[in-house]
Amino acid sequence: MDYTSYYYYGTENWSFCGESELTSAIDYVVSENLPKVYLLTGHGESSLSDSFTSAVKQQNIETAELSLLTLESVPADTDCILINAPQSDISLDEQSKLLEYLGNGGNLFLITDPPKNEKLSNLEALMADYGVSTVDGIVVESDQSLYVWGTPYFLLPDIASHAITTPLTDGGYRVLLPISQGLTVADDLRDTLSVTKLLTTSSSAFAKAAGYDLTTYEKEEGDVNGPFALAVAISDTVDDGITSDIVWVSSAALVD
């Protein structure tokens, strides 16, 4: 099923044309009229859907693939790096190159799923440097108004007011995120950082430590209490008038 273009015509529209929201996120992290977005490769990243690729082209956004394994640094013409659902971790060398790029005012759009095999430790360490960390497991929602089809991990998160979410809130839409990982924001952010929780669960949500092997929707020992963020926008002031912007969404279904 294509979750990014599914609509429900009832008392409320709870899904949306996902490519519109994603291009809104890219527009947020880049300010150039004709931006160039590099798609990171080398870690089993998922291909972008045809509808999203078409929407990107309509926005005059140029895309190209990028392998940091073979380059000394991020190309100078990079307006944003998109990392889409990597299945394996980045190397420490790649982490260093990404940190250098972001530290100079670069922009990142990160889309992840709960890991199926290996933990993405280096990528998560990079994001922890920007005040956001993951919680192991798959998020299950207890509030019946925030999930669909009787499946508590098919989430309908609350939407915060933000430039990125304007296409949703103006249209009265809800976001459908099947299979998400919880994100938490550090309490002690450095002064240069600002983090906005774009999509959030209720306080009764929890993360099932069993992950993809879960056998019950009930809370068990080892599960972690929410609430969680499922998408965040991060802004880091790296110099006078220069910011590094990052958007992180913790469910790759957004671009399927």
Pin down the residues of each PLM region.
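Short, surface-exposed patches at the edges or C-terminal ends of soluble domains, predominantly
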Residues: 1-256
